[in-house]
Regions:
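Short acidic/polar capping segments at secondary-structure boundaries
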Residues: 5-9, 18-22, 36-38, 54-59, ...
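Conserved AdoMet/S-adenosylmethionine-binding subsite of the radical SAM
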Residues: 39-50, 55-176
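Cys/His-clustered metal-coordination modules, chiefly Zn-binding fingers
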Residues: 33
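Canonical Radical SAM [4Fe-4S] cluster-binding loop centered on the CxxxCxxC motif
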Residues: 1-30, 44
Length: 176
């Protein structure tokens, strides 16, 4: 998992990354350096083959540095990691999701949904008050239409909070 920020502005109630809030953005070089350090640590025939932007921070809230880092990691002169082996995980910024689609880089987009309703999602992800699940799904459809890459849904099960049969059925409806 690669971080794009020091701290996180999102404040998900189940995640420690946002406890101190956002401290600062990382540069593209600092983002790439994390992957390079991991690659240096690889031994015994193990090689770094996949990158997930899911460490500290919201990757699409540091859009320019994230995209520049992806291009560097993907480039033959950089790390030579295939775009389809790079995943960007986001809580969902629809405008940035569409921008990423328009970059046509073929990276995998993963949407951290964590709730099947806007009301519950706002409780779990305070930042979610800015955007509806419907707008995220529309941005995800756009991403698929432009890139041909399916969007992955991420969902943390929290006992007694978002794990009922009704939640599962609603989530299945969203995933269709």
């Amino acid at each position: 998992c690669i971080s794009t920020q020091v701290g996180c502005p999102v404040g998900c109630v189940f995640c420690a990354s946002g406890v101190g809030g956002l401290q600062r953005q990382l540069s593209a070089g600092q983002i790439v350096e994390q992957a390079m350090r991991v690659r240096e640590l690889c031994t015994d025939g193990f090689r770094l083959s996949n990158i997930v932007f899911m460490g500290l921070g919201e990757p699409l809230a540091n859009y320019a540095a994230t995209v520049q880092a992806i291009r560097t990691m993907n480039a033959e002169w950089g790390m030579g990691i295939g775009a389809r082996k790079i995943t960007v995980s986001t809580v969902g910024l629809p405008t940035q999701m569409r921008r990423l689609a328009d970059e046509k880089m073929q990276v995998t987009l993963a949407l951290s949904l964590h709730a099947p309703t806007d009301e519950l999602r706002r409780e779990l992800i305070p930042w979610a008050e800015r955007v509806s699940i419907d707008s995220l799904i529309e941005a995800g459809k756009y991403y698929f239409e432009v890139t041909g890459r399916e969007v992955t849904l991420e969902y943390i099960l929290l006992g007694g909070v978002n794990d009922s049969i009704e939640h599962a059925e609603a989530l299945a409806g969203i995933a269709k």
